[in-house]
C-alpha cells in the first residue's frame, strides 16, 4: 500500500468553512475498480481533515492499493482515522461510498467503523438546488 500525505497551510481559512470543517470532520472519497461492491474493490481512499496540531492547516491523505490484496490495509487505515473523526462529509457518499465501504469491510472480515459516525452527503444537501444551478 502506498500512503501519500500533504499538509496545506490555510491561515486564511474562512470562518464559514470552519463551521462545517471541525476537528472531528473527515472529508472522504473512494475510487473503486467498478460499481459492484460484491465484485470490485477499493483501490484508493482519499481523506482531508484539519491537521491535529495546527488549526490553520489541512491534511490531505491518500491510501492507494497497488493490488487487490492490499484493500484490507486501506480499510484499516480508514478505521484508524475514524477513531478521531466522527463526522464524514462525502459527495454522493450515502448512496455509493458508504454502502460500498460497508460491503468491502464485510468481505474483508473487518469490523465496520461507522456505528458512531455522522454522515453528511453534499449531493443530497445540494439536490434541492439542482434546477438553480442547472444540474
Residues covered by each model-derived region:
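Short, flexible, glycine/charge-rich loop motifs used to bind or transfer phosphoryl groups or to couple energy/partner
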Residues: 14-18, 35, 78-79, 108-109
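RNase H-like nuclease fold core
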Residues: 32, 36-51, 60
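Conserved DEDDh/DEDDy metal-dependent 3′-5′ exonuclease domain
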Residues: 57-134
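N-terminal accessory regions of nucleic-acid-interacting proteins
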Residues: 1-24
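Short, charged/polar surface micro-motifs in flexible loops or helix N-caps
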Residues: 51-52, 69
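Two-metal-ion RNase H-like nuclease active-site motif
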Residues: 24-33
Amino acid at each position: 500500500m502506498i500512503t501519500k500525505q500533504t499538509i496545506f497551510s490555510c491561515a486564511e481559512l474562512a470562518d464559514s468553512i470552519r463551521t462545517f470543517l471541525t476537528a472531528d470532520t473527515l472529508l472522504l472519497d473512494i475510487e473503486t475498480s467498478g460499481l459492484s461492491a460484491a465484485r470490485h474493490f477499493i483501490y484508493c481512499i482519499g481523506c482531508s481533515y484539519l491537521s491535529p496540531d495546527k488549526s490553520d492547516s489541512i491534511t490531505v491523505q491518500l491510501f492507494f492499493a497497488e493490488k487487490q490484496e492490499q484493500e484490507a490495509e486501506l480499510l484499516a487505515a480508514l478505521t484508524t482515522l475514524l477513531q478521531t473523526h466522527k463526522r464524514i462529509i462525502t459527495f454522493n457518499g450515502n448512496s455509493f461510498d458508504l454502502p460500498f465501504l460497508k460491503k468491502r469491510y464485510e468481505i474483508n472480515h473487518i469490523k465496520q467503523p461507522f456505528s458512531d459516525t455522522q454522515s453528511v452527503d453534499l449531493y443530497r444537501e445540494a439536490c434541492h438546488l439542482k434546477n438553480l444551478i442547472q444540474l
